Amino acid sequence: MDVNSRLSVQSNVESPLMHEGPEPQQITSSAAGNLAGSITACKKVLRSNSLLESTDYWLQNQRTPCQIGFVEDESENCASVCFVNLDVNKDACITENLQQKLVNVSPDLPNLISSMNVQQPKENEIVLLSGLASGNPQADFDVSQCPWLPDICLVQCARGNRPNSTNCIIFEINKFLIGLEVVQERQLHLETNVLKLEDDTNCSLSSIEEDFLTASEHLEEEIEVDDCRSGLENTNVSANVLESKKPKETTQEGWDYHKEKLHCALGEKHIRKHRTPSTKTEGSKENTEENTSLKSLNRLVRPSHLKSEVAGNKQLATNYSYPENIKGELETSQMLFIPRDAYLSMVKKDVLSPCSVLSEQGGSHRDHDVTPNPLPPVQNGEASTGEYATNLAESVMQDAFIRLSQSQPTLPQESAVSFSMRSALLPSGCCTKDMVVPRSWNELPKIVIVQSPDGSDTVPEPNVSSWPDMEFVETSGIFSADSSSRPTQSALEVALACAATVIGTISSPQATERFAMEQESLVSTYAQRGTGVQQTQVPQAFMAPSTTEYSFPSALCGMTQVASAVAVCGLCEKEEATCPVAPTDLLPTSGASEEISSIGSLVMERSTELGKEAIAEALLREATLILARPDAYSSLGELLESVNQRIIETTSKTQTLCTESVQRNELAHTLSNVILKHSVDELHQKTTMAHPTDERHPCGTLDTLMESVNQLLHNVICFTFKKMNHIVTLSEHPSFDQAAGQAWVKAFACPSSQPLSNAHGTGLVIRNLVEDASPKSNKGGARPELVNNPRLQSEFSCSHRMFDSTAKSFPKEIYLKGIMGEDTRNPHHTLNYDSNERRASTDLGKLTTASEGCSGFQETEDSIVPNTQEKYICATPLNNEAQVNLSLLGDDLSVPAQSTLEAKQSEVYGITDFAEELAETVVSMATEIAAICLDNSNGKQPWFCAWKRGNEFLTAPNGSCRSLKRKKENSSAGSTVRKHKPPRLSEIKRKADEHPELKEKLMNRVMDESMNLEDIPDSVSTFANEVAAKIMNLTEFSMVDGVWQGQSCSRTRLLGGDRWNRLKASSCESIPEEDSEARVFVNSLGLMSTLSQPVSRASSVSKQSSCESITDEFSRFMVKQMENEGRGFELLLDYYAGKNASSIMSSAMQQACQKNDHLNVRPSCPSKQSSTESITEEFYRYMLRDIAKESKDGASSRRSSHDWTTGLLSPSTRSPLCYRQSSMPDSRSPCSRLTVNAPVKANSLDGFAQNCPQDSVNVQPVSRASSSGLCKSDSCLYRRSGTDQITNMLIHETWASSIEALMRKNKIIADDSEAANASPGPVSSGSPLQVEKNANRLATSKGHRGPTLLVQESVDYQRKDAVTEGNHSPVSSPGKTAPVKKPSDFDPRRETSACHNAAGLNSPRRSLCSRDVPLIQIETDQKEECIGEPGPFLSQSGSLEETEGHQPEETIPDVARNEDTAPSTCQSSRDSLETSGEVEVEVLKEDIPRDESRNPPSSSEESTGSWSQLANEEDIPDDTSSFLQLSERSMSNGNSSGTSSLGIMDLDIYQESIPSSPMINELVEEKEILKEQSESIKEHASGLPGRAASPQRSLLVINFDLEPECPDAELRATLQWIAASELGIPTIYFKKSQESRIEKFLDVVKLVQQKSWKVGDIFHAVVQYCKLHAEQKERTPSLFDWLLELG
């Protein structure tokens, strides 16, 4: 077989996406060249002269069939390939139904197929497509849920109904071979690229700060590289896609221009990347062609997602889907307004400059171009981690630049430009465009300006192509405008300087100096130059704050916040979709949206002139006119002229309001986006249904859209006033009414400076406004009636604006408070609004949250600092911290989430999802911001000091951000990162004693001298508190890693900056606190107070530096340590002492938990955090004393204690897995209690190992809800971390040199000889490593079986397979291969063996029997081993069940199904096991088939604390410094079964076991298992682990048929099985939903295994069947039935 032709849509614009010709052009570019940067099509023609084509080859094939697995549709942990069968009846080929089916697979497909003429490939042809966007999530085809699908989609012509000749079968096999092989190779390529890129940039994506820092470090190289790579590639891709539809020259120009532009607008891309999701739902149904072009963008976006894919596939999926949707939306708008060519250009323009497209299309589109700009960023954003970092940096730059540049009033110029734009004057057009559509930070072009401050470059760019010029013009216009006027130039320079500062390079020192000096002048100038209405307004809003309190540090912090928020939103699947940052994107997506955005800008302008009711009315009229009648003006110039005239007339009169316009602008954009999105969605649905293949929507579409939009706007206004009334009513600020007027004025005067105060002030104002305007607004939002209160009227007239202005002071808070807050308080309210409204509000909330979360949040913080200083109403927010938190944080985030949740019940719209996303976004943002601030390298500085200080600490923000970089502890530039030495217990005690007040105020957090309680809380700290409070408010929706909140600087100090950085989020667990008022204290983030039951923390430190025994106090101390340090104490111990320390800690934690019922201890968290040995030693001493004391109590205890100590082996080799901690776990357990998941047993460590049946392990089921789902924070990209050799060495060295000796000396661990004696029998055969691994695995799997399992029960006799695999006792010391391990002679089938099976839990029960390892150790082992050795076990449960292939598969599925609920799993697994009829072993009361004795999947997880974050060893060695604890969700519940926890992780290993056996009933070759233990050990240890390590090697095969009846699904699945076996793929998975006869298939697989069939045998059987089928046709049974009969 060779490649006849290869069609590859490369980043190169030149390469046509698809040629119309009969055969695709041969392009040599490699399909995997770009990281999913383009659609690649490769047609392969099978030649009959290939070895693989010969029948003999297949008949004699002796390969062993690979394993078969079935996964739930949601599974997304392994590479996947979709075989799309294009066989259809000729007459049905063109039907819309088929087209829609293709669209469901991928919107790109129909266009690709038609353009490539592969509608009906020949039998020997196969077309490989990669880079496609995923299909419509709503479609009945589930593939869209698979993030991998978009990555690799194989379109092939199946045999279908054609004769089942041998040649046909071979062709099919070969096609499957090609598809699977390509997927494998591509996966490896992507894997390497992603890893390499991330390694290069040190981007673990663990935190925004890190990314940000990385970006600053690599900005210069990466901007160019990324611009070229991602910008060009992405652009090219989009261009290519468009290209097929539009003349190449134009595309090329546009793209070239865009490339430059993208280069400048990486940040924008980033933002857009996030925004794009907003349009997600709209475009999915768009025309396929348009979708295709958009998808190209999506593909571009995908790379970044690929990066994040490491973190979680779901994100990818989301990303894929949303870019498509966006594209669809864009296409739709374009379609609505533009002919195809125009549309193409528009898309390009969108990518390049929506404005140009708009100009091309008409005035209405002009605004749109801004939105399109975000799309290109999306494209660029996808490229690589490095690119991601760069994008982040650029995004920050852009924000700074936009803030500054937009502040410059260029409105007059803008209008002029608009005319010229219309006239096709590029330079003026550019200016005009920018001015016309100041898209707040959506306008990346400004970044371009950053590159060329003069703006001259920008102007020329627009010239490149007329339509792109428009957008560019806009950019240039801004630049040129800036350049034209000195103040403007200064603003630009300031922006550049700001951006440069963020990036770490200030090109113009003068600019920096001038920045502060000119800020005020610029602001005033801008205000005066109100002409810049939209732009000016936005900039002014920013400028005002900057002038008052704007400093580079604060700017940087704000930008960082924005960037982090954006990144967070973008990285989160849902967040991306929600990210309002892309509101413009939404707008650009549709012409209507464009119009709206322009209108929005106009509205913003109006808002600038809030004082003038006439202007507001005029603008609204203009907007309505524009939206409704794009042709009302012959050209944009006319429209702009009329609008500009009105605006200019009032500009001078509304200088004060100019600043507000920025925020209002953003709000307006957000609202317009929401509205447009909703309208466009409806329109799309209608048009798609009516004219699925029509590229252009019917003329009526615009009217319909207009009508819908107007209705929504009207509703918005009405609801806005209603909500305002509610807000006012609900807000508990009686004094606000009086201060309302003043506050309002202040808000306008210093909108940015008093965000917090305005939160309340705004509320007051709002109340007044509501009182004045609500009656009128109720009337349909009649603006005229608002005239009475001109400011309010204008503002209210534009509800977005109103929110903006309110939001401006406190944009997000008030806005959300109004929308969400009201809803939260009056859920029914939300429900009352029509679904459209609700949806709009939800979206709006989302957008607001996202965009404002970025800009608003930033603004809030920036302004907060000023605000407090300004002493506006800051006090009120502080006093009403809860209120503020709610409004600022809660309403913004949690409240919206809540309201959405409430709405969700009554609405179809995924309000729940939105709420979750919102909560996640908020939490992530808050966490990141807090982390940035917390990790402030200037040790003594309070939390957010960097923001507050101003220019003197120009580098501080960078420094603090840098310190966050997890990989580079000392990378903070210029800032000294103190290495904090964890205090000894004595120190902690001493300090605690010295500062008794700390115990109360700081919730008894142990403080070190660096903490200065005296520091007066500044606005920044206030903000931090509020953030914490807000996060706390979100706990219901997501258990926030609250620790960081609770963590004050002291904690940072205590843990040490680097460690804190790593721990900050994941370690955070909401811990119940006694003081509900804790939030009041500035230094305590107030996290704890919101939690439920109090944790007894009063006696925070033991009174004696050395404890005589593990007293209650000490236990409490340990618990507190864990709470305060995110389980850090245990982590520290674990780091040095390995599993033993961890085990001991578990015991200690159990004891502590016993005393604190509300605490559920889950200490098992591998971590690389550094610590001092002293703590470990001291702790061991306590342990030893306690043990000694216990030993005196009685013979039994003595004996047990002896057994226990004997069983204590040195820690088994730490699994080399790194757990990437996330700043925000994706799913947080809704329960507010700290879940420390340790086996809760207790009286003594020793007792834990005692052999009393009563010693049941109490694993309290804490909510497992959080156990699935990856973190969605940008900072929490979970990386499958690779082995960190250095870390391992360090651990083992430490162990060997100190801890081991210490323990041996104290008899904590037995000598080898003792251990050997202890072990009942020799270690089973197998390499020591394997044995050790197996033992570990066993230990892991032996975790507790159920929420309350008898210890002995927990012992799972590993299913035979597991046992045989590693008969060794689970515990294995690194040095000793498990001397004490379970005897090799242990026969899982022997009942007595139960005793011997020192598997651990069991042995504790019968300590007299071989007392292998103390339960504690096993517990630890389980955790680590489980993680480390998932391969062999596949997932504890999954592999167990799988390995237990002997057991009827049916049983296993049942067990697996229950896996999610550990307890039920145990039961069901037990039952099913019993049913299996395996030999039963009598374990206490229950008889469990030995086979089955292997733990149900959940058991190990329960004990291990659901290691959802298992990392793959091989994946990322570079994350050495970040062994992070599993985030809350993974830790959510010890109970969560392996599947749920595993499911969370990307662990492909677990993918197999994820749903546990039920999901993936993996058939392990029983014969192998039964034959040789050692052999099976090798196979499983090597094969499975290998698979685990590189899950990409396992593939998910998705089959999609245009006509489901057409192909023989069973035959096809069998052939795919053969192909996968030929390729050596360890396991191939099929989607359960697509395989109707799973049981039959499993039976066939079992049969094949029993008969030891090879691939040749299967092939032979298939050939025989095909012959039989050809002869008997109708009477032939199905293949599976026939095979089973044959067997």
UniProtKB/Swiss-Prot annotation:
Family recorded in the similarity comment: Belongs to the AKAP110 family.
Compartmental location: Cytoplasm
GO terms for cellular component: mitochondrion; Z disc
Signal peptide: none
Region (PKA-RII subunit binding domain): 914-931
Sites of Phosphoserine modification: S1010, S1070, S1092, S1105, S1106, S1109, S1244, S1273
Low complexity: compositionally biased ranges: 1495-1508
Protein name per Swiss-Prot or TrEMBL: A-kinase anchor protein SPHKAP
A Pfam family assignment: AKAP_110
Record comment regarding domains: RII-binding site, predicted to form an amphipathic helix, could participate in protein-protein interactions with a complementary surface on the R-subunit dimer.
GN (gene name): Sphkap
Biased composition (Basic and acidic residues): 1382-1393, 1482-1494
